[in-house]
């Protein structure tokens, strides 16, 4: 009896699979892992597989930005229309995340990952073959966004949180960093492919490679997470006394403000991320330099995401949001007066270092100020708002370029949206301090 408490769990075995029934299908879920699997080597190995899957599944978000100048020239469309594949992809990503999360809960995460592999793989291949601009856009939104990327973000983050207790925060941060790792790796790889074999062949190769690799990795994710009681909130994340009046506002008003804040910060964030390659091309530096800047930006974003998580544990979600918003605004301002090659590299690095912690801070804010029973739905809603912001901002920047002939107005537009985000964060901070003062001054009721 005592030995089972000391048995080290190393992963699913053949007997596990036999008990599950191999006739259920190659990607059918295995039974839940034992509780000894939590924080184990098997969990660490699963986290590594998760990181690979998110890095592969998120590639389309960044490859589409790299090929934008070639797509615009090939299809003979405007810069705004060339931005629409990214816009539709992000909208599909946001909607699909909720659908794939529901599928993962019912059928196991491997099922959603297989659909993701099919979506990313077929999306790349069909987009590379089509000669219709609107079909090209719809493929990005439906196959690559709705089915593909969505399967490798929210479901993987949720799954990771169930395999860790002591190191849950850093595990989730590592998992979420796969999205930025994709941004650090794929732009340069895609640009090399575009320069050597063209964007269409690059898409075909990415499609075949992604489909096969993601499907094989999904086989390693069939084990259901250990069954355990609801987790205890992390230290320093206690809810406010009256969770029905977050920030001294109604829950609907407070949530609506966070939704708009998420939208606004990502409209601003999307300008450099979506258009830096095209911007460098227009300045005469070439698409390759722009791809390098995008990779640098997102490599620094990985560092930013991890460091911001540690900062958030110390100062809370709302202050982390304000800090990130101020710094992101400073980075956007640096793009206005400087357009030299070295200056753009520096501005890209600073932008990556400054903005990585903004989006994760919304989850902490909701955990700190709203009822825990509503956390899942509210976090999902605000994260979707950030994706809508990325989609809207990518299109708006392209449209402003078409209207003005440069990206100067697009950067100013991004700064304006960033100010809206900061204004909401400051307002919520003021409302929270005021509600706490009123609570302290109110007479105690016997």
What are these regions (language model features)?
Residues 135-150, 263, 343-356:
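Hydrophobic core of transmembrane alpha-helices in multi-pass small-molecule transporters
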Residues 179-225:
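Helix-loop-helix hairpin linking two adjacent transmembrane segments in secondary transporters
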Residues 140-177:
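Cytoplasmic helix-loop-helix junction between adjacent transmembrane helices
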Residues 45-79, 100, 186-187, 272-277:
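Extracytoplasmic
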């Amino acid at each position: 009896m005592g030995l089972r408490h000391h048995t080290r769990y190393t992963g699913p075995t053949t007997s596990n699979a036999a008990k599950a029934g191999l006739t259920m299908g190659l990607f059918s879920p295995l039974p839940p892992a034992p509780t000894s699997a939590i924080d184990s080597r098997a969990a660490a190995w699963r986290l590594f597989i998760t990181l690979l899957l998110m890095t592969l599944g998120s590639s389309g978000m960044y490859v589409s930005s790299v090929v934008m100048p070639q797509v615009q020239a090939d299809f003979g469309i405007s810069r705004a229309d060339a931005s629409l594949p990214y816009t539709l992809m992000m909208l599909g990503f946001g909607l699909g995340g909720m659908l794939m999360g529901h599928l993962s809960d019912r059928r196991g995460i491997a099922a959603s990952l297989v659909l993701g592999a099919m979506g990313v793989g077929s999306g790349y291949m069909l987009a590379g073959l089509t000669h219709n601009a609107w079909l090209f856009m719809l493929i990005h939104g439906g196959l690559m966004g709705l089915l593909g990327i969505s399967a490798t973000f929210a479901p993987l983050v949720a799954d990771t949180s169930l395999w860790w207790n002591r190191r849950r925060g850093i595990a989730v941060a590592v998992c979420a960093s796969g999205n930025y790792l994709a941004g650090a790796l794929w732009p340069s790889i895609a640009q090399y492919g575009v320069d050597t074999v063209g964007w269409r062949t690059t898409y075909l190769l990415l499609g075949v490679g992604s489909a096969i690799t993601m499907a094989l990795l999904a086989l390693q994710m069939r084990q259901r997470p250990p069954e355990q009681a609801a987790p205890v909130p992390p230290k320093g994340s206690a809810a406010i006394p009256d969770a029905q009046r977050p920030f001294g506002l109604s829950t609907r008003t407070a949530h609506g403000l966070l939704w708009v804040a998420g939208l606004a910060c990502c409209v601003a964030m999307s300008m450099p991320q979506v258009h830096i390659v095209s911007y460098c091309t227009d300045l005469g530096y070439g698409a390759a330099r722009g791809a390098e800047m995008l990779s640098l930006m997102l490599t620094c974003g990985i560092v930013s995401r991890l460091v911001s998580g540690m900062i958030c544990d110390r100062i809370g979600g709302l202050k982390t949001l304000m800090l990130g918003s101020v710094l992101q605004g400073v980075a956007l301002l640096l793009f206005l007066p400087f357009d030299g090659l070295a200056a753009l590299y520096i501005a890209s690095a600073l932008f990556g270092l400054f903005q990585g912690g903004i989006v994760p801070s919304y989850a902490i804010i909701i955990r700190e100020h709203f009822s825990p029973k509503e956390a899942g739905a509210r976090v999902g809603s605000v994260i979707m708002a950030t994706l809508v912001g990325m989609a809207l901002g990518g299109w708006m920047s392209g449209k402003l370029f078409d209207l003005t002939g440069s990206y100067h107005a697009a950067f100013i537009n991004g700064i304006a949206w960033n100010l809206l985000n900061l204004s909401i964060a400051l307002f919520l901070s003021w409302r929270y301090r005021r509600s706490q003062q009123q609570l302290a001054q109110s007479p105690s009721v016997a």
